[in-house]
Amino acid sequence: MAEFQGYLELDRSWQHDLLYPLIFREYIYTFVHDHGLNRNRSNLLENVGYDNKSSLLIVKRLISRMYQQNHLIISANDSNQNPVFGYNKNFYSQMISEGFAVVVEIPFSLRLVSSLKGTEVVKYYNLQSIHSTFPFFEDKFPHLNYVSDVLIPYPIHLEILVQTLRYWVKDVSSLHLLRLFLHEYYSWNRFLIPNKSISIFSKSNLRFFLFLYNSHVCEYESILLFLRNQSSHLRLTSSGGFFERIYFYGKIKHPVEEVFADDFPTSLWFFQDLVIHYVRYQGKSILASKDMPLLMNKWKYYLVHLWQCHFYVWSQAGSIYINQLSKHAFGFLGYLSSMRINLSVVRSQMLENSFLMDNAMKKIDTLIPISPLIGSLAKMKFCNVVGQPLSKSTWADLSDFDIIDRFARICRNLFHYYSGSSKKKSLYRVKYILRLSCVKTLARKHKSTVRTFLKRLGSELLDEFFTEEEEVLSLIFPRTYSTLRRLYKGRIWYLDIFCINDLVNHE
Protein backbone atom coordinates (compact mmCIF):
# COMPACT_ATOMS: atom_id res chain seq x y z
CA MET A 1 0.00 0.00 0.00
CA ALA A 2 2.93 2.34 0.60
CA GLU A 3 3.95 1.69 -3.01
CA PHE A 4 0.57 2.86 -4.26
CA GLN A 5 0.63 5.92 -2.04
CA GLY A 6 4.16 6.85 -3.06
CA TYR A 7 3.45 6.58 -6.77
CA LEU A 8 0.10 8.29 -6.80
CA GLU A 9 0.55 10.82 -3.95
CA LEU A 10 -3.06 10.41 -2.97
CA ASP A 11 -4.92 13.06 -1.01
CA ARG A 12 -8.50 14.12 -0.64
CA SER A 13 -8.52 15.86 -4.01
CA TRP A 14 -8.33 12.46 -5.77
CA GLN A 15 -11.89 11.91 -4.68
CA HIS A 16 -12.87 14.55 -7.25
CA ASP A 17 -10.54 13.47 -10.08
CA LEU A 18 -10.19 9.71 -10.39
CA LEU A 19 -9.67 9.66 -14.16
CA TYR A 20 -6.32 11.46 -14.05
CA PRO A 21 -4.19 8.42 -13.10
CA LEU A 22 -6.19 6.21 -15.47
CA ILE A 23 -5.30 8.35 -18.48
CA PHE A 24 -1.92 9.84 -17.57
CA ARG A 25 -0.24 7.17 -15.42
CA GLU A 26 1.00 4.15 -17.38
CA TYR A 27 2.12 2.19 -14.30
CA ILE A 28 -1.52 1.73 -13.27
CA TYR A 29 -1.72 -0.97 -15.93
CA THR A 30 1.50 -2.50 -14.63
CA PHE A 31 -0.17 -2.89 -11.23
CA VAL A 32 -3.09 -4.63 -12.93
CA HIS A 33 -0.70 -6.97 -14.74
CA ASP A 34 1.27 -7.82 -11.56
CA HIS A 35 -1.94 -8.40 -9.61
CA GLY A 36 -3.20 -10.81 -12.25
CA LEU A 37 0.00 -12.84 -12.25
CA ASN A 38 0.13 -13.04 -8.44
CA ARG A 39 -3.50 -14.09 -8.28
CA ASN A 40 -2.99 -16.90 -10.76
CA ARG A 41 0.14 -18.23 -9.06
CA SER A 42 -1.26 -18.14 -5.54
CA ASN A 43 -4.56 -19.78 -6.40
CA LEU A 44 -3.06 -22.55 -8.55
CA LEU A 45 -5.23 -21.57 -11.49
CA GLU A 46 -4.31 -21.39 -15.13
CA ASN A 47 -2.87 -18.14 -16.40
CA VAL A 48 -5.62 -16.16 -18.05
CA GLY A 49 -3.38 -14.18 -20.37
CA TYR A 50 -2.20 -11.19 -18.38
CA ASP A 51 1.15 -11.31 -20.18
CA ASN A 52 -0.63 -10.18 -23.33
CA LYS A 53 -1.73 -6.97 -21.59
CA SER A 54 1.67 -5.92 -20.25
CA SER A 55 3.01 -4.68 -23.59
CA LEU A 56 4.14 -1.09 -23.18
CA LEU A 57 3.28 -0.42 -26.83
CA ILE A 58 -0.34 -1.50 -26.32
CA VAL A 59 -0.69 0.61 -23.17
CA LYS A 60 0.79 3.71 -24.81
CA ARG A 61 -1.48 3.28 -27.82
CA LEU A 62 -4.48 2.88 -25.54
CA ILE A 63 -3.68 6.00 -23.52
CA SER A 64 -2.98 8.07 -26.62
CA ARG A 65 -6.38 7.09 -28.01
CA MET A 66 -8.04 8.06 -24.74
CA TYR A 67 -6.68 11.59 -25.16
CA GLN A 68 -9.14 11.90 -28.05
CA GLN A 69 -12.56 12.06 -26.49
CA ASN A 70 -14.45 10.76 -29.52
CA HIS A 71 -12.76 7.35 -29.25
CA LEU A 72 -14.28 6.80 -25.82
CA ILE A 73 -17.78 7.15 -27.24
CA ILE A 74 -18.66 3.63 -28.29
CA SER A 75 -22.05 2.77 -29.67
CA ALA A 76 -23.74 -0.51 -28.97
CA ASN A 77 -24.15 -0.96 -32.74
CA ASP A 78 -20.40 -0.71 -33.41
CA SER A 79 -18.44 -3.74 -34.47
CA ASN A 80 -16.35 -5.51 -31.86
CA GLN A 81 -13.31 -4.97 -34.05
CA ASN A 82 -12.25 -1.33 -33.98
CA PRO A 83 -10.14 -0.50 -37.06
CA VAL A 84 -8.58 2.53 -35.39
CA PHE A 85 -7.37 0.60 -32.36
CA GLY A 86 -6.44 -2.46 -34.38
CA TYR A 87 -7.54 -4.69 -31.50
CA ASN A 88 -10.79 -6.07 -30.24
CA LYS A 89 -12.77 -3.29 -28.59
CA ASN A 90 -13.56 -5.43 -25.56
CA PHE A 91 -9.84 -5.93 -25.01
CA TYR A 92 -9.34 -2.20 -24.44
CA SER A 93 -12.51 -1.93 -22.38
CA GLN A 94 -11.21 -4.69 -20.15
CA MET A 95 -7.84 -2.96 -19.70
CA ILE A 96 -9.47 0.36 -18.82
CA SER A 97 -11.96 -1.26 -16.43
CA GLU A 98 -9.23 -3.11 -14.54
CA GLY A 99 -7.16 0.06 -14.32
CA PHE A 100 -10.24 1.90 -13.11
CA ALA A 101 -10.75 -0.75 -10.42
CA VAL A 102 -7.17 -0.26 -9.18
CA VAL A 103 -7.59 3.52 -8.97
CA VAL A 104 -10.91 3.34 -7.13
CA GLU A 105 -9.72 0.62 -4.75
CA ILE A 106 -6.77 2.64 -3.43
CA PRO A 107 -8.76 5.18 -1.35
CA PHE A 108 -10.73 2.34 0.23
CA SER A 109 -7.57 0.40 1.00
CA LEU A 110 -5.84 3.45 2.47
CA ARG A 111 -8.92 4.15 4.57
CA LEU A 112 -8.80 0.58 5.86
CA VAL A 113 -5.12 0.84 6.77
CA SER A 114 -5.64 4.15 8.56
CA SER A 115 -8.55 2.67 10.50
CA LEU A 116 -6.29 0.05 12.03
CA LYS A 117 -4.55 2.87 13.99
CA GLY A 118 -1.11 1.38 14.19
CA THR A 119 -2.16 -2.27 14.15
CA GLU A 120 0.35 -4.30 12.21
CA VAL A 121 -1.11 -5.69 8.99
CA VAL A 122 0.29 -9.10 8.18
CA LYS A 123 0.78 -10.07 4.55
CA TYR A 124 -1.81 -12.30 2.98
CA TYR A 125 0.35 -15.39 2.55
CA ASN A 126 0.78 -15.73 6.33
CA LEU A 127 -2.94 -15.70 7.03
CA GLN A 128 -5.91 -18.00 6.84
CA SER A 129 -7.66 -19.12 3.69
CA ILE A 130 -11.30 -19.83 2.98
CA HIS A 131 -10.71 -23.32 4.40
CA SER A 132 -10.66 -21.66 7.83
CA THR A 133 -14.46 -21.41 7.56
CA PHE A 134 -14.89 -25.15 8.10
CA PRO A 135 -13.09 -25.35 11.47
CA PHE A 136 -15.45 -22.54 12.47
CA PHE A 137 -18.37 -24.78 11.43
CA GLU A 138 -16.92 -27.75 13.30
CA ASP A 139 -16.48 -25.70 16.46
CA LYS A 140 -19.79 -23.79 16.56
CA PHE A 141 -22.42 -25.61 14.55
CA PRO A 142 -22.68 -28.83 16.63
CA HIS A 143 -24.25 -26.67 19.34
CA LEU A 144 -26.83 -25.11 16.99
CA ASN A 145 -30.24 -26.34 15.89
CA TYR A 146 -31.39 -24.34 12.86
CA VAL A 147 -29.70 -23.23 9.66
CA SER A 148 -30.78 -21.15 6.68
CA ASP A 149 -29.18 -20.77 3.25
CA VAL A 150 -29.44 -17.21 1.97
CA LEU A 151 -28.56 -16.26 -1.60
CA ILE A 152 -27.88 -12.52 -1.68
CA PRO A 153 -29.88 -11.05 -4.60
CA TYR A 154 -28.33 -8.82 -7.21
CA PRO A 155 -29.74 -5.40 -8.04
CA ILE A 156 -32.19 -5.42 -10.92
CA HIS A 157 -30.84 -2.19 -12.40
CA LEU A 158 -27.31 -1.10 -13.22
CA GLU A 159 -27.77 2.33 -11.71
CA ILE A 160 -28.04 0.84 -8.20
CA LEU A 161 -24.38 -0.22 -8.39
CA VAL A 162 -23.41 3.27 -9.51
CA GLN A 163 -25.46 4.88 -6.75
CA THR A 164 -23.52 2.88 -4.16
CA LEU A 165 -20.30 4.62 -5.20
CA ARG A 166 -21.84 8.08 -5.46
CA TYR A 167 -21.76 8.44 -1.67
CA TRP A 168 -18.01 8.99 -1.74
CA VAL A 169 -16.96 9.46 -5.40
CA LYS A 170 -17.51 13.10 -6.36
CA ASP A 171 -15.98 12.80 -9.83
CA VAL A 172 -18.95 12.79 -12.21
CA SER A 173 -16.87 11.77 -15.22
CA SER A 174 -15.71 8.65 -13.37
CA LEU A 175 -19.30 7.65 -12.72
CA HIS A 176 -20.13 8.14 -16.40
CA LEU A 177 -17.18 5.94 -17.33
CA LEU A 178 -18.42 3.33 -14.88
CA ARG A 179 -21.82 3.34 -16.58
CA LEU A 180 -20.10 2.92 -19.93
CA PHE A 181 -18.26 -0.19 -18.71
CA LEU A 182 -21.41 -1.73 -17.30
CA HIS A 183 -23.48 -1.20 -20.43
CA GLU A 184 -20.77 -1.84 -23.02
CA TYR A 185 -19.31 -5.31 -22.66
CA TYR A 186 -21.08 -7.03 -19.78
CA SER A 187 -24.29 -9.02 -20.22
CA TRP A 188 -26.68 -7.86 -17.54
CA ASN A 189 -28.71 -11.04 -17.95
CA ARG A 190 -26.13 -12.84 -15.78
CA PHE A 191 -27.32 -10.81 -12.81
CA LEU A 192 -30.89 -11.96 -13.40
CA ILE A 193 -30.14 -15.71 -13.63
CA PRO A 194 -29.64 -17.12 -10.10
CA ASN A 195 -27.48 -20.10 -11.04
CA LYS A 196 -25.07 -17.81 -12.89
CA SER A 197 -24.98 -15.00 -10.35
CA ILE A 198 -21.52 -15.88 -9.04
CA SER A 199 -20.08 -16.63 -12.46
CA ILE A 200 -18.86 -13.05 -12.73
CA PHE A 201 -15.97 -13.90 -10.39
CA SER A 202 -14.44 -16.30 -12.91
CA LYS A 203 -14.67 -13.95 -15.86
CA SER A 204 -11.95 -11.81 -17.34
CA ASN A 205 -13.05 -8.65 -15.50
CA LEU A 206 -12.86 -10.24 -12.07
CA ARG A 207 -11.24 -7.32 -10.25
CA PHE A 208 -13.66 -4.74 -11.60
CA PHE A 209 -16.88 -6.61 -10.85
CA LEU A 210 -15.62 -7.94 -7.54
CA PHE A 211 -15.00 -4.35 -6.52
CA LEU A 212 -18.55 -3.34 -7.44
CA TYR A 213 -20.01 -6.40 -5.78
CA ASN A 214 -18.13 -5.84 -2.51
CA SER A 215 -19.13 -2.20 -2.36
CA HIS A 216 -22.77 -3.24 -2.73
CA VAL A 217 -22.78 -6.18 -0.30
CA CYS A 218 -20.71 -4.49 2.40
CA GLU A 219 -23.13 -1.59 2.43
CA TYR A 220 -25.96 -4.01 3.18
CA GLU A 221 -23.87 -5.88 5.78
CA SER A 222 -23.13 -2.65 7.62
CA ILE A 223 -26.84 -2.07 8.08
CA LEU A 224 -27.33 -5.71 9.02
CA LEU A 225 -24.73 -5.37 11.79
CA PHE A 226 -26.41 -2.20 13.00
CA LEU A 227 -29.68 -4.14 13.38
CA ARG A 228 -27.82 -6.93 15.11
CA ASN A 229 -26.28 -4.50 17.60
CA GLN A 230 -29.68 -3.03 18.36
CA SER A 231 -30.94 -6.49 19.30
CA SER A 232 -28.17 -7.03 21.84
CA HIS A 233 -27.38 -4.99 24.95
CA LEU A 234 -23.91 -6.46 25.36
CA ARG A 235 -20.77 -4.95 23.88
CA LEU A 236 -19.37 -8.00 22.11
CA THR A 237 -16.22 -8.28 20.05
CA SER A 238 -16.11 -9.80 16.62
CA SER A 239 -13.20 -11.05 14.52
CA GLY A 240 -13.18 -10.42 10.80
CA GLY A 241 -10.98 -11.40 7.87
CA PHE A 242 -10.09 -8.46 5.63
CA PHE A 243 -9.34 -9.04 1.97
CA GLU A 244 -7.74 -7.07 -0.79
CA ARG A 245 -10.40 -8.39 -3.13
CA ILE A 246 -9.17 -11.98 -2.76
CA TYR A 247 -6.40 -11.99 -0.16
CA PHE A 248 -6.62 -11.52 3.60
CA TYR A 249 -5.18 -8.35 5.07
CA GLY A 250 -5.34 -9.73 8.59
CA LYS A 251 -7.48 -11.18 11.30
CA ILE A 252 -8.04 -8.41 13.84
CA LYS A 253 -10.23 -7.85 16.86
CA HIS A 254 -12.29 -4.71 17.29
CA PRO A 255 -15.59 -3.74 18.82
CA VAL A 256 -18.26 -4.53 16.26
CA GLU A 257 -19.10 -0.84 15.79
CA GLU A 258 -15.52 -0.06 14.73
CA VAL A 259 -15.03 -3.08 12.50
CA PHE A 260 -18.02 -2.38 10.30
CA ALA A 261 -17.27 1.31 10.04
CA ASP A 262 -14.52 0.35 7.55
CA ASP A 263 -15.65 -2.97 6.20
CA PHE A 264 -15.47 -2.34 2.44
CA PRO A 265 -12.81 -4.91 1.41
CA THR A 266 -14.56 -7.78 3.17
CA SER A 267 -15.13 -10.79 0.92
CA LEU A 268 -15.38 -13.43 3.62
CA TRP A 269 -16.97 -12.44 6.93
CA PHE A 270 -18.38 -14.14 9.97
CA PHE A 271 -19.73 -12.75 13.24
CA GLN A 272 -21.33 -14.29 16.24
CA ASP A 273 -23.45 -13.19 19.16
CA LEU A 274 -25.32 -15.01 21.87
CA VAL A 275 -27.94 -16.54 19.61
CA ILE A 276 -27.04 -16.28 15.92
CA HIS A 277 -24.10 -16.97 13.60
CA TYR A 278 -23.54 -15.50 10.15
CA VAL A 279 -21.08 -16.63 7.48
CA ARG A 280 -20.78 -15.26 3.95
CA TYR A 281 -18.62 -15.94 0.95
CA GLN A 282 -19.30 -13.99 -2.24
CA GLY A 283 -23.05 -14.20 -2.91
CA LYS A 284 -24.07 -16.90 -0.46
CA SER A 285 -24.50 -16.59 3.29
CA ILE A 286 -25.41 -18.98 6.09
CA LEU A 287 -27.51 -18.05 9.13
CA ALA A 288 -27.52 -20.47 12.06
CA SER A 289 -29.09 -20.28 15.50
CA LYS A 290 -29.51 -22.40 18.61
CA ASP A 291 -32.92 -21.08 19.62
CA MET A 292 -36.38 -21.65 18.20
CA PRO A 293 -37.19 -20.71 14.56
CA LEU A 294 -38.87 -17.51 15.77
CA LEU A 295 -35.51 -15.72 15.87
CA MET A 296 -34.53 -17.03 12.45
CA ASN A 297 -37.84 -15.83 11.03
CA LYS A 298 -37.21 -12.39 12.48
CA TRP A 299 -33.83 -12.16 10.78
CA LYS A 300 -35.27 -13.52 7.54
CA TYR A 301 -37.83 -10.72 7.34
CA TYR A 302 -35.16 -8.21 8.36
CA LEU A 303 -33.14 -9.24 5.32
CA VAL A 304 -36.07 -9.22 2.90
CA HIS A 305 -37.29 -5.78 3.97
CA LEU A 306 -33.75 -4.42 3.93
CA TRP A 307 -33.19 -5.58 0.36
CA GLN A 308 -36.56 -4.38 -0.90
CA CYS A 309 -36.87 -1.03 0.87
CA HIS A 310 -33.30 0.20 1.06
CA PHE A 311 -31.55 -1.42 -1.91
CA TYR A 312 -34.57 -1.80 -4.22
CA VAL A 313 -33.76 -5.47 -4.78
CA TRP A 314 -36.63 -7.89 -5.24
CA SER A 315 -36.64 -10.81 -2.83
CA GLN A 316 -39.28 -13.00 -1.24
CA ALA A 317 -39.33 -14.37 2.28
CA GLY A 318 -40.60 -17.68 0.90
CA SER A 319 -37.32 -18.21 -0.96
CA ILE A 320 -35.37 -18.37 2.33
CA TYR A 321 -35.89 -21.70 4.06
CA ILE A 322 -35.20 -22.47 7.71
CA ASN A 323 -34.18 -26.07 8.29
CA GLN A 324 -33.22 -28.23 11.23
CA LEU A 325 -29.48 -28.70 11.21
CA SER A 326 -29.76 -32.32 12.32
CA LYS A 327 -31.94 -33.20 9.30
CA HIS A 328 -30.69 -30.85 6.60
CA ALA A 329 -27.37 -30.69 4.76
CA PHE A 330 -26.27 -27.28 3.50
CA GLY A 331 -23.86 -26.53 0.68
CA PHE A 332 -21.13 -23.95 1.15
CA LEU A 333 -17.83 -23.33 -0.65
CA GLY A 334 -18.24 -26.47 -2.74
CA TYR A 335 -18.70 -28.79 0.27
CA LEU A 336 -21.86 -30.47 1.50
CA SER A 337 -21.96 -30.11 5.29
CA SER A 338 -24.33 -32.02 7.56
CA MET A 339 -24.73 -32.96 11.20
CA ARG A 340 -23.60 -36.45 12.14
CA ILE A 341 -24.37 -38.03 15.53
CA ASN A 342 -21.84 -40.51 16.89
CA LEU A 343 -23.40 -42.87 19.44
CA SER A 344 -21.27 -44.57 22.07
CA VAL A 345 -21.89 -46.53 25.25
CA VAL A 346 -19.88 -45.65 28.36
CA ARG A 347 -19.69 -47.96 31.35
CA SER A 348 -19.43 -46.21 34.69
CA GLN A 349 -18.94 -47.72 38.12
CA MET A 350 -19.64 -46.07 41.45
CA LEU A 351 -18.72 -48.09 44.53
CA GLU A 352 -20.38 -51.47 44.02
CA ASN A 353 -22.85 -50.32 41.40
CA SER A 354 -22.08 -50.15 37.68
CA PHE A 355 -24.29 -48.80 34.95
CA LEU A 356 -24.19 -48.02 31.22
CA MET A 357 -24.71 -44.56 29.74
CA ASP A 358 -25.56 -43.74 26.15
CA ASN A 359 -23.43 -40.88 24.88
CA ALA A 360 -24.31 -38.98 21.70
CA MET A 361 -21.78 -36.58 20.19
CA LYS A 362 -22.68 -34.19 17.40
CA LYS A 363 -20.14 -33.60 14.66
CA ILE A 364 -20.17 -31.62 11.42
CA ASP A 365 -19.42 -33.89 8.48
CA THR A 366 -18.06 -32.36 5.26
CA LEU A 367 -18.69 -34.37 2.09
CA ILE A 368 -18.00 -33.93 -1.61
CA PRO A 369 -21.10 -33.33 -3.78
CA ILE A 370 -20.03 -35.69 -6.54
CA SER A 371 -22.99 -35.12 -8.89
CA PRO A 372 -22.50 -31.33 -9.20
CA LEU A 373 -18.75 -31.91 -9.54
CA ILE A 374 -19.27 -34.31 -12.46
CA GLY A 375 -21.69 -31.77 -13.89
CA SER A 376 -18.91 -29.17 -13.79
CA LEU A 377 -16.54 -31.59 -15.53
CA ALA A 378 -19.19 -32.23 -18.18
CA LYS A 379 -19.64 -28.51 -18.69
CA MET A 380 -15.89 -28.21 -19.28
CA LYS A 381 -16.12 -31.10 -21.81
CA PHE A 382 -14.01 -33.57 -19.80
CA CYS A 383 -16.89 -36.07 -19.74
CA ASN A 384 -20.55 -36.39 -20.61
CA VAL A 385 -23.42 -35.85 -18.18
CA VAL A 386 -23.23 -39.44 -16.85
CA GLY A 387 -19.47 -39.23 -16.18
CA GLN A 388 -18.04 -41.04 -19.21
CA PRO A 389 -14.64 -39.48 -20.08
CA LEU A 390 -14.28 -37.54 -23.34
CA SER A 391 -11.29 -36.19 -25.20
CA LYS A 392 -10.60 -32.49 -24.78
CA SER A 393 -10.53 -31.52 -28.45
CA THR A 394 -9.54 -27.90 -27.83
CA TRP A 395 -6.28 -29.04 -26.21
CA ALA A 396 -5.30 -31.50 -28.94
CA ASP A 397 -3.01 -28.94 -30.59
CA LEU A 398 -0.85 -28.55 -27.47
CA SER A 399 2.32 -30.50 -26.78
CA ASP A 400 2.11 -33.80 -24.91
CA PHE A 401 3.75 -32.25 -21.86
CA ASP A 402 1.28 -29.34 -21.75
CA ILE A 403 -1.71 -31.66 -22.12
CA ILE A 404 -0.58 -33.93 -19.28
CA ASP A 405 0.39 -30.94 -17.13
CA ARG A 406 -3.01 -29.28 -17.52
CA PHE A 407 -4.97 -32.41 -16.65
CA ALA A 408 -2.67 -33.25 -13.73
CA ARG A 409 -2.85 -29.72 -12.34
CA ILE A 410 -6.65 -29.79 -12.36
CA CYS A 411 -6.61 -33.17 -10.60
CA ARG A 412 -4.13 -32.01 -7.94
CA ASN A 413 -6.06 -28.80 -7.34
CA LEU A 414 -9.32 -30.70 -6.78
CA PHE A 415 -7.65 -33.12 -4.35
CA HIS A 416 -6.01 -30.15 -2.64
CA TYR A 417 -9.29 -28.28 -2.25
CA TYR A 418 -11.29 -31.31 -1.08
CA SER A 419 -8.64 -32.46 1.38
CA GLY A 420 -11.02 -31.57 4.23
CA SER A 421 -13.63 -34.13 3.22
CA SER A 422 -14.14 -37.08 5.53
CA LYS A 423 -14.86 -39.37 2.56
CA LYS A 424 -12.55 -39.03 -0.42
CA LYS A 425 -13.60 -42.14 -2.37
CA SER A 426 -15.69 -40.08 -4.77
CA LEU A 427 -12.57 -38.11 -5.72
CA TYR A 428 -11.06 -41.23 -7.24
CA ARG A 429 -13.92 -41.26 -9.74
CA VAL A 430 -12.97 -37.70 -10.69
CA LYS A 431 -9.34 -38.81 -10.96
CA TYR A 432 -10.37 -41.67 -13.26
CA ILE A 433 -12.36 -39.27 -15.49
CA LEU A 434 -9.46 -36.84 -15.81
CA ARG A 435 -6.86 -39.55 -16.44
CA LEU A 436 -8.89 -41.25 -19.14
CA SER A 437 -9.84 -37.90 -20.67
CA CYS A 438 -6.13 -37.06 -20.80
CA VAL A 439 -5.33 -40.38 -22.52
CA LYS A 440 -8.14 -39.90 -25.03
CA THR A 441 -6.90 -36.40 -25.80
CA LEU A 442 -3.36 -37.67 -26.39
CA ALA A 443 -4.63 -40.56 -28.50
CA ARG A 444 -6.72 -38.16 -30.56
CA LYS A 445 -3.71 -35.95 -31.12
CA HIS A 446 -1.56 -38.89 -32.30
CA LYS A 447 -4.47 -40.41 -34.26
CA SER A 448 -4.38 -43.65 -32.33
CA THR A 449 -6.62 -45.71 -30.07
CA VAL A 450 -6.45 -45.49 -26.28
CA ARG A 451 -5.28 -49.09 -25.88
CA THR A 452 -2.55 -48.76 -28.51
CA PHE A 453 -1.36 -45.47 -27.08
CA LEU A 454 -1.09 -46.82 -23.51
CA LYS A 455 0.62 -50.02 -24.68
CA ARG A 456 3.22 -48.00 -26.54
CA LEU A 457 4.06 -45.46 -23.82
CA GLY A 458 3.15 -47.33 -20.62
CA SER A 459 1.27 -46.26 -17.52
CA GLU A 460 4.26 -44.20 -16.26
CA LEU A 461 3.05 -41.49 -18.59
CA LEU A 462 0.36 -40.53 -16.06
CA ASP A 463 2.47 -40.43 -12.91
CA GLU A 464 1.74 -36.71 -12.78
CA PHE A 465 -1.69 -37.60 -11.39
CA PHE A 466 -0.05 -38.71 -8.14
CA THR A 467 -1.61 -36.10 -5.85
CA GLU A 468 0.29 -33.67 -3.70
CA GLU A 469 -1.15 -34.99 -0.43
CA GLU A 470 -0.09 -38.53 -1.27
CA GLU A 471 3.45 -37.34 -2.04
CA VAL A 472 3.84 -35.38 1.20
CA LEU A 473 2.47 -38.12 3.43
CA SER A 474 4.57 -40.79 1.71
CA LEU A 475 7.70 -38.75 2.51
CA ILE A 476 6.73 -38.38 6.17
CA PHE A 477 5.66 -42.01 6.64
CA PRO A 478 7.55 -43.97 3.98
CA ARG A 479 7.27 -47.38 5.64
CA THR A 480 3.99 -47.33 7.52
CA TYR A 481 1.36 -47.82 4.88
CA SER A 482 -1.47 -48.12 7.40
CA THR A 483 -0.55 -44.80 9.02
CA LEU A 484 -0.30 -43.15 5.62
CA ARG A 485 -3.67 -44.54 4.62
CA ARG A 486 -5.28 -43.39 7.89
CA LEU A 487 -3.88 -39.87 7.64
CA TYR A 488 -4.82 -39.48 4.01
CA LYS A 489 -8.41 -40.43 4.82
CA GLY A 490 -8.53 -37.80 7.56
CA ARG A 491 -9.37 -34.14 7.15
CA ILE A 492 -6.68 -31.68 6.13
CA TRP A 493 -7.50 -27.96 6.01
CA TYR A 494 -5.00 -25.78 4.13
CA LEU A 495 -4.10 -22.13 4.65
CA ASP A 496 -3.13 -21.35 1.05
CA ILE A 497 -6.52 -21.45 -0.69
CA PHE A 498 -7.64 -17.90 -1.33
CA CYS A 499 -10.56 -18.38 -3.71
CA ILE A 500 -12.97 -21.08 -4.74
CA ASN A 501 -12.10 -23.19 -7.78
CA ASP A 502 -14.34 -22.80 -10.84
CA LEU A 503 -15.02 -26.55 -10.97
CA VAL A 504 -15.96 -26.53 -7.28
CA ASN A 505 -18.30 -23.53 -7.49
CA HIS A 506 -21.69 -25.14 -8.18
CA GLU A 507 -23.82 -22.15 -7.19
Curated annotation (Swiss-Prot):
One of its GO terms (cellular component) is chloroplast. It is found in: Plastid, Chloroplast. GO terms for biological process: mRNA processing; RNA splicing; tRNA processing. Its main location: plastid. It comes from the Eukaryota. Keywords: Chloroplast, mRNA processing, Plastid, RNA-binding, tRNA processing. The keyword tRNA processing applies. It holds the Pfam family MatK_N. GO terms for molecular function: RNA binding. InterPro entries: Domain_X (IPR024937), Maturase_MatK (IPR002866), Maturase_MatK_N (IPR024942). Usually encoded in the trnK tRNA gene intron. Probably assists in splicing its own and other chloroplast group II introns. HAMAP family: MatK. Belongs to the intron maturase 2 family. MatK subfamily. This is Maturase K. It comes from Humulus lupulus. The gene is matK.
